Every structure is written in C-alpha cells, then in structure tokens.
Amino acid sequence: MFKDYKRMFRFDTETNSLNPEPCGEILELGGILLTKPEGSDKFSERQDISVLIKNKYPLLNSDIHHITAEMCQGNGVTKEELFELLKGIFGDYSDTLIVAYNSPFDMKFVRAFMEEMSPGYKITNPVLDMLEVARDRTGLYRGNKLCDMIVRYDVKDVENSHRALDDCNALLGVMRAMWKEKPDIENYIRK
C-alpha cells in the first residue's frame, strides 16, 4: 500500500472557528507520522505527535473538543515551534503523503498558518481525503462523519473524541478497514 511514499502523515486539527480568517486558529494538532525504513516497502516506524498551541484569540467550541485556554497557555507550544514541526513534516518531501478526514478543512488552517509564519510558503505534498473515500463507499454526501465510519466498519478500541490524536488513531483504524473492503484508496490521492 502506498508504494510511492516514504512517509505518511495522518493528522487532525482542533480549531477555534470554522475558518482561519479573520481570527481562526489551530488549537491542537495531532498526527501519526509513519515512515518506511530504508529498503522496506512497509510503514513500520511510528511517531505520535500531539501539541496544543498558545493562542491569542478566545477559545470557542470548548464544549466540543474540551480544550481550555488554560491547557493551551500552560502546555502549548509557540507558533514558532509549531511552524518548525510542520516544516519538518511537509518540507520538501514530495514522498510524504498527507492524510486527513475532511482534509480541505484541516489543510486550509495549516496552509493559512504556514503562510502567516512564512509569507509565500506553499505546501505541495500529495493529500488523501478519507472523507471523499467514505462518501464514495456509502454513496451519501451526508452522514459520513468519522464517528459514523467507526460504527460502519466496526473499528474497535478507538475513540472519536474531537481531540486531535484520538481522531488520528480512529482514522487509522477506519482507513485500514476501508482498504480491506476495497484496496483502491490510492486512487483518491490528489497531487
């Protein structure tokens, strides 16, 4: 699976709004970075990433993701630290596949953030949106939330909690189940 890629970054964001403009920000970024060791065709090295970000705007939607201002201020990384982390993942790696559930939402926040930190910065990695796969599999436009896919594919031992790393683990389970159902997921990659 995914033979053209040396790394795969499955990620999710929790945000304080639905749009990055005028003052929407990433509150939390979670991800699972999978790497193929040299000479291998299987992803076997895993790095879990979970960071809260120190923000200047008020937190909204705390009732959904349960992230508080105190959590971000006390345990959060600076925007500069997040930028360096993401640059190391997205960087100049055309062999790193980016995977998300509803990737247009997450990517618009990440792109806006990277552009804010470094004007002109472009993310050029190939992207796989698993929501697009889910819509094709169900034949429905609505009713394809990640929690719906967890139930549909009977994925065990995962939680869709609206916390970024939990949702990445759920995505990993759903993605494996979808691959077993029909191994055509690579056809959905947008370069």
Regions found by a protein language model. Name each.
Residues 1-3, 152, 172-191:
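Acidic two-metal-ion nuclease catalytic site recognized across multiple nuclease folds
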